[in-house]
Amino acid sequence: MAVCGRVRGMFRLSAALPLLLLAAAGAQNGHGQGQGPGTNFGPFPGQGGGGSPAGQQPPQQPQLSQQQQQPPPQQQQQQQQQSLFAAGGLPARRGGAGPGGTGGGWKLAEEESCREDVTRVCPKHTWSNNLAVLECLQDVREPENEISSDCNHLLWNYKLNLTTDPKFESVAREVCKSTISEIKECAEEPVGKGYMVSCLVDHRGNITEYQCHQYITKMTAIIFSDYRLICGFMDDCKNDINLLKCGSIRLGEKDAHSQGEVVSCLEKGLVKEAEEKEPKIQVSELCKKAILRVAELSSDDFHLDRHLYFACRDDRERFCENTQAGEGRVYKCLFNHKFEESMSEKCREALTTRQKLIAQDYKVSYSLAKSCKSDLKKYRCNVENLPRSREARLSYLLMCLESAVHRGRQVSSECQGEMLDYRRMLMEDFSLSPEIILSCRGEIEHHCSGLHRKGRTLHCLMKVVRGEKGNLGMNCQQALQTLIQETDPGADYRIDRALNEACESVIQTACKHIRSGDPMILSCLMEHLYTEKMVEDCEHRLLELQYFISRDWKLDPVLYRKCQGDASRLCHTHGWNETSELMPPGAVFSCLYRHAYRTEEQGRRLSRECRAEVQRILHQRAMDVKLDPALQDKCLIDLGKWCSEKTETGQELECLQDHLDDLAVECRDIVGNLTELESEDIQIEALLMRACEPIIQNFCHDVADNQIDSGDLMECLIQNKHQKDMNEKCAIGVTHFQLVQMKDFRFSYKFKMACKEDVLKLCPNIKKKVDVVICLSTTVRNDTLQEAKEHRVSLKCRKQLRVEELEMTEDIRLEPDLYEACKSDIKNYCSTVQYGNAQIIECLKENKKQLSTRCHQKVFKLQETEMMDPELDYTLMRVCKQMIKRFCPEADSKTMLQCLKQNKNSELMDPKCKQMITKRQITQNTDYRLNPVLRKACKADIPKFCHGILTKAKDDSELEGQVISCLKLRYADQRLSSDCEDQIRIIIQESALDYRLDPQLQLHCSDEIANLCAEEAAAQEQTGQVEECLKVNLLKIKTELCKKEVLNMLKESKADIFVDPVLHTACALDIKHHCAAITPGRGRQMSCLMEALEDKRVRLQPECKKRLNDRIEMWSYAAKVAPADGFSDLAMQVMTSPSKNYILSVISGSICILFLIGLMCGRITKRVTRELKDR
């Protein structure tokens, strides 16, 4: 399609074609002897040549002889040199003067119809050069310099004659002799048909010979100055011009130099058709080819696109002044400045049309077609059997070559550079993608109007897709996804101009260590999401892009490179530029991460490199639920229902986990699977990891550095949750994950792996972790108590079960049954207490008497468990951690409290730990069931001596020390078994030092203690002062129950001096001197001291003597007022009474009187005869 109307397959453009052709034409025409300008110039109006009137075709020249037609070679070469290097001037005519003057050749500037215009518009030094004048007049566009219609018409005839004369072919054959021999297609063209020039224009990109290239360039410029000169164009597009109303096609009716507008109009019609579902006007196939052909031919020199040249002439001077014309450089420069504020609107519009044509046919871009020619052929991206409309599309070229790059194939750097430019171009202007216009027109008008520059429209649509501004149709969403794949911004963030500009500052600070354009820049940005370095605008743009990248694993180039083999092997994926309608978004990545966390036993695992990439992606995407396609798709309704107010970072997933039991089945499965995955690799929780970084560095760096986590890191964080360095965010995050774990035992990876077989065997159909823990721990306890030969729970499960039990004691919320039962009590009594560190549990214990029945029962059960296994008492273990290391390093977990109690009064004991031990002793003494050692030791004694109390007792409620008080009394009577006696002695000794360890005393004497012994009770260290105060003030005590308790104390102290700390302290030296040989217990040392007191030869310590005398008085008083506890006590009281003779006399007299009455009055019953008895 150049000179002679043959449409060819491959066309290229070059630089400034309009001028050299005329020089060559002049050289050819100068061969005539004394004739006018010659055939190509026609007899213009004027003299000497018999010119035709304007608008008429010039008459045919007579046939020249062969000799005339072919001058000698030297003359030909001279003429060619003259024509090619004379800047277009015609050689002097041989003979008479031509039109417009005499001698020196015919001059266009001297023609009457153009003289005035040339003088006004063109510089004087160009007047003698026909080509310079033609170029000058041809490029005039300003209204004030408008060319007259007569001159326009003259120029039209002049150019038409130039471009239609077959004799140009002979010049071409001489000027391009060596080129023609190299280009086989052109050498085979028939002679005399005028096809030669057309062929050379077709192959202009391959012409290396300077003179030939200049000749063809000039010829092309003349042709492109008017669409009617493009042979065949008018025939192919005549109907379309009329249909689209693109202007007149009749000669002379319109300014010939505005005919570039006609081509521009047709181009707009072509691109508009592609952007409409049902176009009203369709451009014919022949005209489409012709339009794209013209665009291809003008691709190397923007002068050849007449409409764009005139529209952008000023902008070229402004932005691309130093850009040399040729090879499409000016086009590219203007494209790069398209969205500059100072770019004129008409130029921007012309550039957009040009870009849309490139999108339809990549050959319209000279640089792209040239740079990628070999690569396209190498990777079969222009297969002949594909529809041309498809293979020519820019998107197809980009996808095909990108696929090669992603497969690791070598694509030339020049081609990759061009691809980068055009990918950026597509991302920058949505209007260049017909699919976006077609599918997203409504969304753009509704949501994104006025945002047409620098990629902002596409990001606006992305924002809508993310659900931040409304809903987006599926067709539009698919079109966006396709465009993202075509442009592939994941491979180079610079392709996305909106992202590039928004994130420039972040990249300069946070990612400056990564090479510009590296795919890992996006990964770096994701790692800094929601950090101080991230800026809000960058955050939005990044998440908008990541939304689409997350839905197609191929859009992450690093992931694709490392995992394509695994994906093909395990997930049956297609090639990079192939898609499967059957595979939902994110399906391949879901497949990859399922295999990433398989064990060696499960087989079919990912390669190490791929696994690392999958983990990287998981860590990044966990920051936003919208980056998980399956999660967002299945949980959209639940997110709206439960989590509409959770808008802060990471809250949506936490919210879904909190409402796990309320979610729809599909959503629950997705959230459950993700949570299960997190339990194995908590680093997926990127926000939590970021918050916990200081703790990880200080306490968990060993496990954090492991490539395979397997739950170790979370376990470490839980263990160090209450370190001083722990910040609030990390603690809250760790606790939240613990709470989520309680919903399903699968969410605790180590527990699941250690116990899954045991759970299936012993606890089938149990899902909640707390229930599984209870089930397994109950089984373990039963096996232990029954001394089973073999435990039903495996050793590895028992070990992990212990870890889980200990973790659950730290926060009441980790024990859901207890938490639910005590919610109202927590609100009433512990509202100011923070969760964690078992503080709420401790608060409930302290307020146990005020708790609701259900909560009280649960707390009692908890205390019973803790006393049986003190290691489960979180507060005790925490407060006494160092003391346990010091005093009980080898103690069994179940004897831990017993060991601490034995060392409680050591000088090295920490006061806080001592206080905590006392608290636990107080609790134990409220009920024998809370003291496992006592319970076991007194197993036979309790039912024997305290049966009445047991019958009245209720399960899950304290006996307030009644059983222990009962055993104390029997201890005083020396009637307990030796094991039980040992335990009761310890209790009596401890309670004698601290009144709080005697619940019955505290219960019945609270008023007396407050009134009579307030100062002693307020002492920080209890050493028996309160008990001594009560004993001293026994006579002042009015309450019978309290008096009874004090008397019981006196009775107990009589049994053994060790249970009377005040007396024991006072008499310690005397015991050592006088009673050292006496075995302690059963009142033996007390009797020794009493004997020493009566022995006048023994001198006791004054304090000891005084205390002993006080005790004797108290015992004497106690004996008088204390009620008999049985017949033996009654007999003892009678025998020790001063009036025993009187009492015995009264008793004897009463018996005698009763006997006498019987003798005197006879029998009371009726007499019965012997017969009746024997019957």
Swiss-Prot record:
GO terms for cellular component: extracellular matrix; Golgi apparatus; Golgi membrane; microtubule organizing center; plasma membrane. It comes from the Eukaryota. It comes from Mus musculus. It is a single-pass type I membrane protein. Cys-rich GLG1 repeats lie at residues 112-145, 146-208, 211-274, 282-342, 343-409, 410-469, 471-533, 534-600, 605-664, 666-724, 725-784, 792-852, 854-907, 908-975, 976-1031, 1037-1097. The keyword Ribosomal protein does not apply. InterPro entries: Cys-rich_GLG1_repeat, Cys-rich_GLG1_repeat_euk, GLG1. This is Golgi apparatus protein 1. Residues 54-83 have a biased composition (Low complexity). Binds fibroblast growth factor and E-selectin (cell-adhesion lectin on endothelial cells mediating the binding of neutrophils). Glycans are attached at residues 161, 206, 577, 673, 782. Keywords: Cell membrane, Cytoplasm, Cytoskeleton, Glycoprotein, Golgi apparatus, Membrane, Phosphoprotein, Repeat, Sialic acid, Signal, Transmembrane, Transmembrane helix. Fucosylation is essential for binding to E-selectin. Contains sialic acid residues. The chain crosses the membrane at residues 1142-1162. Residues 1163-1175 are cytoplasmic. GO terms for biological process: bone morphogenesis; negative regulation of protein processing; negative regulation of transforming growth factor beta receptor signaling pathway; protein processing; regulation of chondrocyte differentiation; transforming growth factor beta receptor signaling pathway. Residues 30-83, 89-108 are annotated as: Disordered. The lineage of its organism: Eukaryota, Metazoa, Chordata, Craniata, Vertebrata. The modification Phosphoserine is found at residue 957. Pfam families: Cys_rich_FGFR. Residues 1-27 form the signal peptide.
